[in-house]
A protein has these predicted regions:
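Surface-exposed loop and membrane-interface regions of Gram-negative outer-membrane beta-barrel proteins
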Residues: 1-35, 46, 53-68, 147, ...
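Outer-membrane beta-barrel translocator domains and adjoining extracellular loop/strand segments
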Residues: 7-13, 58-66, 99-112, 116, ...
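Extracellular/periplasmic loop regions
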Residues: 9-25, 169, 173-225
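Transmembrane beta-strands of outer-membrane beta-barrel pores
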Residues: 1-5, 41-43, 50-55, 92-96, ...
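Residues that define the transmembrane beta-barrel architecture of outer-membrane proteins
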Residues: 28-33, 70-74, 117-121, 153-157, ...
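Repeated loop/turn-to-beta-strand initiation elements of outer-membrane beta-barrel proteins
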Residues: 43-47, 84-90, 131-137, 167-172, ...
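Residues on the lipid-exposed face of transmembrane beta-strands in outer-membrane beta-barrel proteins
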Residues: 34-39, 76-80, 123-127, 159-163, ...
Length: 225
């Protein structure tokens, strides 16, 4: 994909050095969005290469596709469907092509890297219990190397329940985040989500409550997504 601006850059795109302006994180540049090999079988699939990975509601793993430069992943993704309604997913990722790319090193910093290298493992198990209930358990082990000492690496484990009953949609989710790999911090952060929705004559109404918590102490921080 390609991102090009028209006119002067009177904003901070995170690459142009215009730090006196507000951030619009859509830097100029061109990059290969996807390049992959894919195998499909009636019981699952496997994908190798640069690819989109969008899990669940994309709160933790997704493409951030509303930005001009979509986030994609370099690695392998395997999905297995051994039973009706059950999907088991595993991904190994060695590089994240972030929304701050392409990686031409213009004012590139650890805070907004074009590429995030590392060794990450994503595990996701989703089961459609009944038409009104889907249950998803997951663990995302992110070993990220863009900060010295592994300060952004984390392990997130959670459970999500969602569905619709009598036209009312709902979602309940809890996750816990701790340090992982070489992260020297002592993380213990919680995530909560509750949503209710209803559609009236094609208009969707939704109310939600979301908490990204953090524990006390100098070695902790807020829940990261």
């Amino acid at each position: 994909d390609n991102v090009s601006r028209i006119g002067d850059a009177s904003y901070n795109e995170t690459r142009n050095g215009q730090s006196e302006y507000s951030v619009v994180a859509d830097p100029d540049g061109s990059e290969v969005n996807q390049a992959l090999l894919r195998y499909d079988h009636k019981y699952g699939s496997a994908v190798l290469g640069r690819q989109r990975i969008n899990l669940d509601n994309q709160r933790f793993v997704g493409g951030v596709a509303w930005r001009q430069n979509e986030q994609t992943y370099d690695g392998v993704l395997g999905q297995l469907k051994p039973l009706d309604g059950l999907t088991l997913s595993y991904a190994y990722i060695d590089n994240i092509n972030s929304i701050f790319g392409p990686g031409d090193n213009r004012f590139d910093t650890a805070a907004n890297p074009a590429n995030i290298e590392g060794h990450s493992h994503l595990l996701n198990a989703q089961y459609i219990v009944m038409p009104e209930l889907t249950a998803t358990a997951y663990q995302y082990r992110l070993g990220l190397d863009n900060l010295a000492g592994g300060g952004q690496s984390s392990k997130t484990t959670g459970l999500r329940l969602n569905g619709a009953i009598a036209g009312v949609s709902y979602a309940l989710e809890y996750a816990q985040q701790s340090e992982y790999a070489d992260n020297p911090l002592d993380l213990d952060s919680d995530y909560y989500l509750a949503e209710l929705g209803y559609t009236v004559q094609g208009v969707a109404l939704k109310a939600g409550y979301e908490v990204l918590g953090g524990d006390e102490g100098p070695g902790n921080r807020a829940f990261q997504t």
